[in-house]
Amino acid sequence: AKKTLKNFKKGNNFYYWYRVKKEAQIIAKQRNKKESLNYIVAEFDKIEKPNNKILFDIANFYKNSKKYEKAIKYYTAIIDSIDKNSEIKPDLLYRRGGSYERIGLYKKADKDLLYALKISPDDAYVLNYLAYSWLERNYKINEAITMLETAYSLKSNDPYIIDSIGWAYYLTDDYLKAEKFLKSAVELMPDDPIVND
């Protein structure tokens, strides 16, 4: 596989970047994520005019490596460059909002996530993420529960959404409902430490 990847030269940004991404993934699997990130960043810096696809990839690599400020920088660059009605905007807002939330910039996080929901009100994952963030902050609990109930109606077999709604009921002392949902979450994903905490 590596020999094939080497054939993608730097002259063609698309194929060059495809090779770089694949090699970074191989490094992450065979060695470690830090080395993988260092490699892809070094290669990214060699590209004079990265397009939005490349910016999106590097932002995701930073986000997955918990380098949230860097991720925000590149998500913002894409958001600023695309049409306001672009179909990819809600996903970018979700990713940037999640990055803001991770570093405690909750006002900016809420703004992005609510904007994403304004564009795509039936996105179960954005509903779940924002609602869970509010639960953790003890903020707008009733609204958070309503959002989670909507998310559950859209994705009734998702263990993370089921776990979130169970946690919401637990926080509001509705222990019977909480037990039902939390048990269901564990059954759907018994080996996940997040669900089993």
Where are these regions (language model features)?
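Single-residue signature of alpha-solenoid repeat helices
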Residues: 4, 36-37, 71, 109, ...
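Hydrophobic/aromatic packing residues within the alpha-helices of TPR/SEL1-like helical repeat arrays
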Residues: 5-8, 40-41, 68, 75, ...
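Structural marker of alpha-solenoid helical repeat scaffolds
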Residues: 10-13, 46-47, 81-85, 119, ...
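Alpha-solenoid helical repeat scaffolds
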Residues: 17-23, 53-57, 87-95, 125-129, ...
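Residue-level recognition of tetratricopeptide repeat
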Residues: 25-26, 60, 98, 132-133, ...
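Register position in tetratricopeptide repeats
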Residues: 29-30, 64, 95-98, 102, ...
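Short coil/turn linking the two alpha-helices of tandem helical-hairpin repeats
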Residues: 31, 83-87, 135-139, 173
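TPR-repeat structural position
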Residues: 33-34, 68, 106, 141, ...
